[in-house]
């Protein structure tokens, strides 16, 4: 979260070289659910790369193959994984029934944004010009929720393969239904729930921020690009404060 500290709203009076302050930070990292834990891990040199958590992610028994050329498999079973986080949907204006249709990046983004505002001292009893506060996030173009929703639409392929294998119509439909039940249902909130740009929009909407809200996809440089755009937004005088990151 960055601010020019100007607040007069007049772009012509803002020096292009005016200093930009990082006035608050909110974060969720592997083995660090908040800023204090993250900083402590840095000081202690904690390596947060771990084995894949089978209970919440995927089983190496299903996807691990030491041969890098093996199709549809992976030869790595380690990475940085965040811990399960409690999320109260009503606090963020989301109906509980819509949680499954909302990508985790949108949910985690709102948590991190709230923590950044609190860390900056803007959460309670401190006024600021919300109309000149922007949200710019770095986010990949394909979100996690796209995978199960897309897979659910493959039922014609499953049905054809089952029937070609000699199964009768009743058994085929039973198997198709069982496979479908393992994926997230499509519903009216699925499309906004899987769109990357909605991550910034949800933050702006929930916290009543009227400045620019958008996302940028620059692959591994997405978060840094978002911060770069946030700095440009501040230097141009279009915003007094920007929530930025990814």
Functional labels for PLM-detected ranges:
Residues 2, 8-246:
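Cys-dependent condensing catalytic cores that perform Claisen condensation/acyl-transfer
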């Amino acid at each position: 979260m960055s601010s020019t500290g100007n607040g007069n709203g007049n772009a012509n009076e803002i020096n292009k070289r005016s200093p930009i302050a990082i006035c608050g930070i909110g974060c969720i990292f592997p083995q660090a659910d908040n800023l204090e834990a993250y900083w402590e891990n840095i000081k202690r040199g904690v390596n947060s790369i771990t084995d894949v958590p089978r209970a919440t992610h995927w089983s190496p028994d299903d996807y691990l193959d030491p041969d890098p050329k093996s199709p549809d498999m992976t030869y790595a079973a380690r990475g940085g994984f965040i811990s399960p986080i409690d999320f109260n949907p009503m606090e963020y204006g989301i109906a509980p029934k819509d949680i499954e249709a909302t990508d985790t990046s949108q949910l985690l983004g709102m948590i991190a944004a709230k923590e950044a505002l609190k860390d900056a001292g803007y959460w309670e009893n401190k006024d600021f010009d919300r109309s000149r506060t922007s949200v710019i996030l770095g986010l990949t173009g394909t979100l996690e929720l796209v995978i199960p929703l897309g897979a659910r639409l493959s039922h014609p392929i499953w049905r054809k393969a089952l029937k070609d294998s000699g199964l009768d119509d009743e058994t085929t439909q039973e198997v198709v239904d069982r496979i479908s039940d393992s994926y997230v249902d499509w519903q009216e909130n699925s499309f906004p729930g899987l769109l990357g740009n909605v991550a910034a929009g949800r933050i702006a909407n929930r916290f009543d921020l009227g400045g620019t809200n958008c996302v940028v996809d620059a692959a591994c440089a997405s978060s840094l690009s978002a911060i770069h755009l946030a700095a440009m937004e501040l230097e141009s005088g279009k915003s007094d404060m920007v929530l930025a990151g990814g």
